[in-house]
């Protein structure tokens, strides 16, 4: 995967698929499977945000000499997404099927809007901006993706 768009776009789709699997498991009341898949989703999302916030956004902010551009908005959106994930985790722990599915609808809309801006505008812009240096950024992100995920319950 030799572009930021390709690498992170693929990761977006992986997160989406895990979220769909978790919803399907909850809808079918397959709770053990839902626990396992939701945990995998949380870990993937946490790694995704870490790749963006600790590598990509930092490189962008350094290049534009500022932190109050689009990355500030995206960091706020990550926090909002995380607060909905927290509600999903709580609903799952309570085996509250309808609450989980309701929060999942909200989450899907928030993530779709956020990812659309990244996929269509932000990542392609970074691919152009960083030229050959993008390979170093992808390598740094890959290291985060391959590191063991923190326990999402902590
Ligand atoms: Fe993001
Ligand atoms: Fe993203």
Each predicted region: which residue ranges?
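Small-residue-biased structural context
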Residues: 1-154
